[in-house]
Amino acid sequence: MKNVKYGKCVRCGKTYDAVPDLTNCECGGILDIVYDYDYIKSVLTKEKLAKRENRSMWRYRELLPVEETTPDTPLRVGWSPLYEEPKLAQMLGIKKLWVKDDGQNPTASLKDRASAMAVAKAYEAGAKTIACSSTGNAASSLAGNAAAAGFKTYIFVPERAPKGKVAQLMIFGANVISVKGNYEETFKMSAEAIEKYGWYNRNAAINPYLSEGKKTVALEIAEQLNWEMPDYLAISVGDGCTIAGVWKGFKDLYAIGFIDKLPRLISAQSYGCYPINRAIQENKPWEPMEENTIADSISVGVPRNADKALAAIRESNGIAVCVTDEEILAAQRLLGRTCGVFGEPAGVTGAAALKKACEEGLIEKDATVVSVVTGNGLKDVANAIKSAGEPLHIEPDLDLMVKGFAERGVTVE
């Protein structure tokens, strides 16, 4: 790969050749992919990019760690819509707001970006089987992307994973193992199996290429905003891979001169599980936490990408905002009823944190903000019903309809 120099440990600084099956440093640290920005600047310009018809994450190949001969993955991942939301911006008391709906990806979450990268690197490695552990979205994204590309998958999920997400796995033909335990126990079992059977490792906390796939959401946002960067970007945080990838994407664009400023990150976590935000708020190393939140996709008590995530938040002079599950459900309703965007609880945690930050005066009135919705609401119908309530149940009688809605404070007209 002419555009990649090496993988570098974020903890000890040791470097490694960028082979397809690259994993953690021998010290246990996570690797970061280091690029040759001079080379990238010589082969990629804004004008060249603008002429490309490819509307997927692979339009940014010069900024991605793949060989020139590696084919694009079959499913169209990326280039999700970025909606300007003036009404919601006014409600929040800020200048401008955009909502990036990554629930529009093939398996309905941002994690398709990482799984597409995993499939590409598994192809380069000559692997036939890919495996991971997940609370749901990474699992379904791997299952779908791997199925389209002809790979076999083994996927480990904690038994609390929502049925809708597990159903996706089964439809995609994955070999699913539901583990009686929390995410950490599920992760350890997957790691043991991957080592024993030699499967390609899609675990984001181990495989440094996956955050490179996730960073494409930042590349898209910048291009969709015509390279005019927002002041803030709000996004939900679980193991830390996504927020680290977003920051890496913005820094890549800054390094090659495509943007002239970097946004501040708003790290959003639930009070039911917030090890990364607690480390920021208390200015100390992260510590494991119990997992107790409806936002299952970010319910990670042992965030193995914490080093990268914490560095990203601190480098950006970011804000760590925690919200309750009730505030998450309120944000789900707000986005749905104001923007027409249906996000799952973890997917709208960024929006919930943004709302809270605005209410607490942490965001300037003249600020411009992007809020990323990381997953579609249909992935967790049970909590959607809990959030929105039940429909009006009546006999087929219009008078009963009018009466029923009147009892709910709604006038039929």
Per-region residue spans from a language model:
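PLP-dependent amino-acid enzyme catalytic core
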Residues: 1-413
